[in-house]
UniProtKB/Swiss-Prot annotation:
It comes from Porphyromonas gingivalis (strain ATCC BAA-308 / W83). InterPro entries: Macro_dom, Macro_dom-like. Belongs to the MacroD-type family. Induction: Very low background expression levels, induced by oxidative stress due to hydrogen peroxide. SMART domains: A1pp. It comes from the Bacteria. Coiled coil: none annotated. This is Macro domain-containing protein PG1779.
């Protein structure tokens, strides 16, 4: 029922119900997409994140979107790549699962994901794309939510396009 769209762009400009933040466990901002989302949302996001007491790897928490076009930010903590034998695939799939679960529980109809864990956490992009698409596809097959994967570059987008 839902559909997946893959695009290149700035996730902070997504005009849907929610964007997903690839956060660190503190939820207090950082580099990459995490820093960009915190900067674009404004200081209120950090204030709300301080009340959440962090987030374990593979899990997700929701906040308001504040100055973002999206109404909500769903923060998820992706795994750091340590060779693939330390539960990384399951933890990455859990990021997508728990984020979508929160969105569906809230009745959201559109959500945008970044490429979780593929930056400084060094998750191999081809494997991350495969896990993302399989997990998302399984969940939205019979649910009315549209998912956009917002890639950082055309090269990143290719990893998702070739998985289709």
């Amino acid at each position: 029922m839902g559909k997946i769209t893959i695009t290149v762009g700035d996730i902070t400009r997504f005009e849907g119900d929610a964007i997903v933040n690839a956060a660190n466990h503190t939820l207090l901002g950082g580099g990459g997409v995490d820093g960009a989302i915190h900067r674009a949302a404004g200081p209120e996001l950090l204030e709300e994140c301080r009340t959440l007491n962090g987030c374990p790897t593979g899990e997700s928490k929701i906040t308001g979107g504040y100055n973002l076009p999206a109404q909500y930010v769903i923060h998820t903590v992706g795994p750091v790549w340590h060779g693939g034998q330390h539960g990384e695939p399951e933890l990455l799939a859990s990021c997508y699962r728990t984020s979508l679960s929160i969105a569906l529980d809230k009745g959201l109809k559109s959500i945008a994901f970044p490429c979780i864990s593929t930056g400084v956490y060094r998750y191999p992009k081809d494997q991350a794309a495969r896990i993302a698409l399989a997990t998302i596809g399984e969940i939205i097959a019979d649910r009315p939510i549209d998912v956009t994967i917002v890639c950082f570059s055309e090269a990143d987008k290719e990893f998702y396009i070739t998985q289709d």
